[in-house]
Amino acid sequence: MDKTRIPVIVGTGQVTDTTSKPEEGRSPLQLMHDAVKLAAADSGAQDQGAALLRGLDSVTVIRLFADTLPRFASPFGKLANAPWSIAQRVGAANATDLVQGGDSQVVILARACERIAQGERQAARVGGG
């Protein structure tokens, strides 16, 4: 392994909204975006991590449970491409996007780390909703 390409987690963020009335609550996409901003700020990078976010070349989102099975579908529809939406919101214009499902959170993190270690990626965002 190239010692200059050791992947590290530089920031984490989690957002929940258990107190808002349903009609006033944030959408799953807004909650994800808020978590991304918290993770960027947690990184300690300048400008609350804005440059770090713009430099993302990979954005992955774990598929929402409500989008998995029709019987759990939200009456408000589903997110067609949450990773793309997050990439656009944070200015990561060159990021590839991927929706991943199942119990694969750690697999996705491992893949992101592997791609960084191999030089295929510079920075990656992994998250769910």
Regions found by a protein language model. Give the residues of each.
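Glycine-rich anion/phosphate-binding loops
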Residues: 30, 104-107
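Conserved phosphate-binding catalytic cores of ATP/NTP-utilizing and phosphoryl-transfer enzymes
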Residues: 106-114
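Conserved "HGTGT" condensation-loop signature of ketosynthase/thiolase-family condensing enzymes
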Residues: 1-97, 113-121, 125-129
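Short beta->alpha junction loops
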Residues: 98-103
